[in-house]
Amino acid sequence: MENYSDQIAGVDEVGRGALFGPVVAAAVILADATIQQLLDQGMTDSKQLSPRQRLSLNQHIREQAVAYQIGMASVYEIDRLNILQASLLAMRRSVLRLSITPQRCLVDGNQKIPQLPMPQTTLIKGDQSEPAIAAASILAKVWRDQLIIRLDQRYPCYHLASNKGYGSAKHRQALQDLGPTRQHRLSFTPCQVSPLFR
């Protein structure tokens, strides 16, 4: 585990594999004094937590973080750039929007974020080993899930509240029956069906 005496930001993204909606990233700076408290409250990789646990930890992280910020890349940007570059763009935005400039970033995965002014360390499965990355994964996941649930009210036939934009059987069937919406990623093969833009 990294020593957090410096101001180090953990950075992670969610939604890369979804068929619908933006890719969302978060950057989080945690103080040494709060890390153990958050770990004691169950903080870990967001994928290992229930929705209720994520919501509770999301609140604790927001209250206790030195700084945090969300970044997003739109469906248009995903289709124009590709999902990898859009994910890196969302992560870059989250870091650059922080109220405190971190001295270093710990980035989940194996890709460094382009055009950041500070050093970076990439960590595969970093959300399982680094508290600041785990915190970022939780903030990004909760923010994106809440957005998708709101969009489910506009597009109820795609079952977004349950699948969060990922390619469940019901979601794929709705794409076949109804075609994609403006929030579907047309560069993703399952979304390349007609009629377009309901």
Regions found by a protein language model. Give the residues of each.
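RNase H-like, Mg2+-dependent phosphodiesterase core
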Residues: 1-198
